[in-house]
């Protein structure tokens, strides 16, 4: 297979030969980026999972498909606090808080996953503006831009067909972007750079596409 465009990008881009992460899972790794600490040191070693997702994961653990087989501690799963009560401890100081106090304009774009209530949301953690990804980030199942490719597994209908657009600005009502979410968030990030080029700013851009 010829991959001339990818080869050209690789030849003219930056090559990262080593990558490091402070945690093996999503949210704790993000907490480490925000605080400069190992998340396990302040009690945030697990990724908060929305209530419906807990049911899905438990269901998958019972599937016969070996590729989806997992292990679920039912006692723990059934006694977790609400998703809305979980997040990075608010006493932790983020880089956004430090830079905001130093006079920087601070903006968050993309996924957050460090809490959405009780002072754990982006704006309470040092960001002046936040264009977030709330929940899933999928198009509607019947969107004309979607090429439907169904799989013979029960999770396909459960997740794909029930997930909707989830862009949200400063905690407002979720809305549908006018383009693919990766393009949308990239374009909005470029606007932040353009609009703030003459003053100190900090942009935290977290795309969803490379996550899953």
Residues covered by each model-derived region:
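Formylglycine-dependent
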Residues: 49-105, 112-201, 207-212
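Active-site nucleophile/metal-coordination loop of metallo-enzymes that catalyze phosphate/sulfate
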Residues: 21-44
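Hydrophobic beta-strand anchors of alpha/beta hydrolase catalytic cores
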Residues: 6, 16, 106, 202-204
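Short, solvent-exposed loop/turn elements at domain surfaces
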Residues: 18, 41-43, 137-142
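Surface-exposed patches in mature extracellular/periplasmic domains of secreted proteins
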Residues: 17-22, 45-47, 109
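Active-site-proximal N-terminal segment of extracellular/periplasmic enzymes that hydrolyze or transfer
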Residues: 1-14
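Alpha-helix exit/C-cap motif
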Residues: 14-15, 39
């Amino acid at each position: 297979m010829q991959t001339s465009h990818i080869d050209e990008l690789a030849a003219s881009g930056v090559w990262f030969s080593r990558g490091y992460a402070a945690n093996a899972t999503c949210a704790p790794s993000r907490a480490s980026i925000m605080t400069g600490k190992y998340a396990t040191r302040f009690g945030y070693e697990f990724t908060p999972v929305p209530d419906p997702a807990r049911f899905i994961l438990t269901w998958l653990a019972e599937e016969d498909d070996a590729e989806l087989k997992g292990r679920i501690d039912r006692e723990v799963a059934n006694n977790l606090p609400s998703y809305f009560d979980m997040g990075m401890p608010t006493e932790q100081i983020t880089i956004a808080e430090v830079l905001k106090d130093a006079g920087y304009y601070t903006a968050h774009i993309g996924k957050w996953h460090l809490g959405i209530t009780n002072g754990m949301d982006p704006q309470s953690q040092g960001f002046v503006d936040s264009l977030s990804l709330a929940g899933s980030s999928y198009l509607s199942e019947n969107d004309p831009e979607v090429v439907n490719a169904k799989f013979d597994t029960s999770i396909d209908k459960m997740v794909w067909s029930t997930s909707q657009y989830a862009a949200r600005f400063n905690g407002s009502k979720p809305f549908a972007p006018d383009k693919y979410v990766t393009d949308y968030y990239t374009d909005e990030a470029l606007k932040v750079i353009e609009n703030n080029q003459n003053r100190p700013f900090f942009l935290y851009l977290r795309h969803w596409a490379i996550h899953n």
